[in-house]
Design a protein with these regions (language model features):
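Residue-level preference for hydrophobic side chains embedded in well-ordered alpha helices
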Residues: 24, 28, 32, 36, ...
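Short, Lys/Arg-enriched C-terminal cap helix and immediately downstream tail that follows
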Residues: 36, 88, 130, 135, ...
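Short, basic/polar amphipathic helix motif occurring as a linker/hinge flanking DNA-binding modules
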Residues: 86-107, 114, 182-187
């Protein structure tokens, strides 16, 4: 049997075809898991629960999918929104930035590891002090690579509001880092090694 294209698959699930619900799950589950992993990390204790919540939300909101973007983009946006809401409820977590530093990028000398760890903690401290919306817009766009349209959808803002938050958030992050003697000293120490 030839696989259904996304439009026909969505139409079949919308019409109540329960046999196609399994095909929809198979089609979208990978993108959901990748999105949750990218934003939260696979080792997070809530990973499996959030994947399941995102799958449920996909089915609940299927009537709102208009086909204006690919099914993968829509799936990733819904999934990211679930993660965003979850993290907002539990607060800004330390591991968001810690995960961004790949183990192979981490200095291996005994002197460099604590310096880098301290720098990450300082950056997280500054993000936690910022307005929540600005910090998350900065993280989603500049760290995780979401487009402004996607950031707006994830955070429930207009594209103009997301753009404004991004500009102000970037400016604030840069100012905070530039004015932080611990970060400036840490950068100097890392560059000297």
């Amino acid at each position: 049997m030839e696989p259904l294209d996304d439009a026909r698959l969505v139409a079949a699930v919308r019409s109540g075809n329960s046999a196609m619900a399994g095909a929809f799950y198979d089609r979208t589950r990978g993108m959901v898991a990748r999105t949750v992993q990218r934003l939260l990390g696979a080792s997070d204790s809530d990973f499996d629960d959030l994947v399941q919540v995102a799958m449920i939300e996909l089915l609940r909101s299927l009537d709102r999918y208009r086909g204006e973007c690919s099914l993968d983009t829509w799936t990733a946006t819904i999934s990211a929104n679930i993660v965003y809401k979850h993290i907002r409820r539990r607060g800004l977590e330390r591991h968001i930035f810690a995960r961004e530093i790949a183990p192979e990028d981490v200095p291996q000398t005994a002197h460099q590891r604590p310096v880098l760890r301290g720098m990450v903690e300082r950056v997280l401290h500054h993000l936690a002090q910022m307005a929540h919306e600005r910090a998350w817009t900065f993280l989603l766009h500049d760290v995780h690579g979401y487009s402004l349209d996607e950031v707006a959808a994830i955070t429930g803002a207009t594209v103009a509001a997301a753009q404004s938050r991004l500009v102000r958030g970037r400016r604030e992050v840069h100012e905070r880092i530039a004015n932080d003697p611990d970060l400036a000293g840490g950068l100097d120490a890392r560059e000297d090694s």
